[in-house]
UniProtKB/Swiss-Prot annotation:
The keyword Signal is annotated on this UniProt entry: yes
Pfam families associated with the record: Defensin
Cellular localisation: Secreted
Organism: Arabidopsis thaliana
GO BP annotations listed: defense response to fungus; killing of cells of another organism
Disulfide bond recorded as keyword: yes
Top-level lineage group: Eukaryota
Keywords: Antimicrobial, Disulfide bond, Fungicide, Plant defense, Secreted, Signal
Chief location category: secreted
Protein family: Belongs to the DEFL family.
InterPro entries (alphabetical): Defensin-like_dom (IPR056373)
Signal peptide range: 1-27
The protein, known as: Defensin-like protein 43
Residues passing through the membrane, by range: none
Length: 81
């Protein structure tokens, strides 16, 4: 009984820790600063997604990048400083 209770408690704490640690990641949003034309050049597609976008942005000297679909970005790869 003690092992089962300990296991359930550990599992509950593990799930709780995972939920809390993802909270800030899900709430964050990338907002480009400066001119959008300078930081949102490449169009995103099924073959050019967040991974390739972030890689290309880092190669261009930015810290990261992501495909943004909302207006005014229009499904473009936007880099962040």
């Amino acid at each position: 009984m003690g092992i089962t209770k300990t296991s359930v408690t550990f599992l509950f704490l593990l799930i709780l820790a995972a939920f809390v640690s993802n909270y800030n990641v899900l709430a964050s949003e990338i907002k480009p600063t400066g001119r959008i034309d300078d930081q949102c050049k490449q169009m995103c597609s099924a073959t050019y997604g967040d991974g390739k976008c972030a890689s290309d942005c880092r190669k261009a000297g930015f810290s990261s990048g992501r495909c943004l679909t909302s207006s005014p970005f229009g499904n473009k790869c936007c880099c962040t400083k």
